[in-house]
């Protein structure tokens, strides 16, 4: 059986920013091949292997506030 585009299932789930037209046709556009994809709501960037999506242009303070402070042990909480 000859190989045809679009006959193999996607290896990874559809993510925000993926084009349903591209998925149906099985053809890749230059936008998806250059490592950047755009969405009306946010900028998305794919890693070179198309394994992950990264939201670009997010201030570092957002990441800093998302981190949880390290859990304190009971020894640190008791005053000496």
Swiss-Prot record:
**Top-level taxon of origin:** Eukaryota
An example of a Pfam family matching this protein is UPF0731
The signal peptide, as residue positions, is: none
Which residue windows does the record flag with biased composition (Polar residues)? 33-42
Q: Where is the composition biased (Low complexity)?
A: 15-32
Q: Where is this region: Disordered?
A: 1-45
The record's family statement is: Belongs to the FAM229 family.
The protein's name in its UniProt record: Protein FAM229B
């Amino acid at each position: 059986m000859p190989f045809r585009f679009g006959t193999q299932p996607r290896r990874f789930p559809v993510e925000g920013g993926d084009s349903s037209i591209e998925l149906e046709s099985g053809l890749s556009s230059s936008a998806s091949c250059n490592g950047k994809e755009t969405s009306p709501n946010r900028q998305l960037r794919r890693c070179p292997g198309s394994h992950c999506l990264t939201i670009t242009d997010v201030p570092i303070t957002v990441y800093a506030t998302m981190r949880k402070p390290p859990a304190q042990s009971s020894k640190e909480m008791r005053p000496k």
